[in-house]
């Protein structure tokens, strides 16, 4: 049985290098010959370690307090007069049993401590100058900026990490490569510098913090109205707890709120048209919003309205900057003139998915499969001057190839069947002397067309990266040597295999239930 590693959930081409994220690690390869270069590993967040330690200490203290209390009392309200203390009779036998149970609970909890693991990578992007890789580790809500090492191995090193107020779900980089634009699932879009600078709070900010200092808490009860020793202790603890000064929990780095949606954001793009910059955002409420670029991002230029279900992916072909292609939970791919907000065409994607599944599934199963677009990608064939659009859907072992015609229609030309569900796509550098290549990462852990059923342990395991070269206006599968990590990270056990669903398949969860509509 071969060793199984976590599949690659994100792929990006960075010049002559392939940047591939699997779990909480990023592998880098030479895209020309497939040679392995290095692996960057996400660190275990310190905040998670501290919170876990504090939680365990608190739990231990509570257990100790509960075990010490053998004669429970009724805690009196401060306004009530003293009442008789009623002691509950506890037999010797029952007391011994209780102690045994409590001791066994402690042993059980202490015998299986939770192991802290680094947060998986949920988003990945590259700056236009190819100098930096920006990754989002979702569990700790951190944006990490990585730079290339000036060594032969061309490894990545982290130069900054910034924890956002909410979990980022999509990233974009401005054309000057100086600003990161981050969208989170609570509908907010922030800008922050690519390379952070020390942020010194101003005197005005310090004054405002002093003005917001909380007043001292004065409980209505006092030592004159509380008589029992236990209630006096509770009163003192209440005073100490209530008089604690609340600490500032906001980010301590330079950042700015640009705009906000009232719904969960799903994707973001930065576009430039006629010398003016725009920010395009998509959300769960079927909206595509066109806003002006920084510093006027609060001004809404237009909306692209027409989707019935959520919008999950946006794509603007660099060769056709006025055109937007969007997809999500609808059966169709939409083509827009995004600045005018006008819908140019719709192309059915579900029919292609159903045609693929006909051989493997019954008609009822194929009909019940809903579209959840996970990727819309663009490539340019310089030989035929064709704009190529590639679309993938969640839980579908295929990639669907379209031509974007001069009349702004998407024409289906090919379906690439894959040995596993498609996860991410990227291209090698197009070279006029040789055809460019398409690289697709697949899920080789689950059965094709399924997001829950694991493959049999004795079944053959496909390569997590599939390669295709473009010849005569068609993609042809090719065998590519290399592209194999050499570290020991990412090897999966049975429990980790079951936990992959949440990382690899999260677009379909955006679909609203009947009671949400």
From Swiss-Prot:
Region of interest: Disordered: 40-117
InterPro entries according to UniProt: Trm82, WD40/YVTN_repeat-like_dom_sf, WD40_repeat_dom_sf
Subcellular location field: Nucleus
Start-end of Basic and acidic residues biased regions: 52-64
Keyword field contains Glycoprotein: no
WD repeats (start-end): 116-158, 260-301, 306-346
Swiss-Prot/TrEMBL GO biological process terms: tRNA (guanine-N7)-methylation; tRNA modification
Pathway: tRNA modification; N(7)-methylguanine-tRNA biosynthesis
UniProtKB keywords: Nucleus, Repeat, tRNA processing, WD repeat
Gene3D superfamilies: YVTN repeat-like/Quinoprotein amine dehydrogenase
Top-rank lineage group of the source organism: Eukaryota
Family membership: Belongs to the WD repeat TRM82 family.
Record text on subunit structure and interactions: Forms a heterodimer with the catalytic subunit trm8.
Physiological role: Required for the formation of N(7)-methylguanine at position 46 (m7G46) in tRNA. In the complex, it is required to stabilize and induce conformational changes of the catalytic subunit.
Protein name per UniProt: tRNA (guanine-N(7)-)-methyltransferase non-catalytic subunit trm82
Source organism (scientific name): Sclerotinia sclerotiorum (strain ATCC 18683 / 1980 / Ss-1) (White mold)
Gene: trm82
